[in-house]
């Protein structure tokens, strides 16, 4: 829903569309963040507020087969779309005129890939909360190993991302007597690892 609002406010053409997309995303994101804050403010501090806070931290603690099946359709559909059309994502790195010469509708394809990615993200977040850094760290790691082609990066990111989450979730259950939310551990591990990747690629050199 938020993605549709961003595209609606950004428009479909004209100058500075990228800037409008970024600004629209910031505005919509800020609005929904304030709605979450309002929900926390009016929530029952004894019962509802801890559940909201724990969900925002991100964890696999409450996962079940029933919950997984409720979002599996969206996740699998999004993954299939990205895998089937991943070669077209490489074409988007070319100029718009060159992309059109391949018979690809630039705006339509971009919207389709964003919609597929958003469906996956929304389904996952609804089940286990906001677990960050995986979507930022793992694709960069895969690009270092397999190169820049999305033909290899997308499938490997899916596999390595799942393995990374399983490892961090297992560690979060074993480090202390009470389970640490997985998002805390992914941030503690992901932030320094991402800095190392930047340093290896020369991103921190002057």
Each model region followed by its residue ranges:
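Alpha-helical transmembrane segments in inner-membrane proteins
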Residues: 1-206
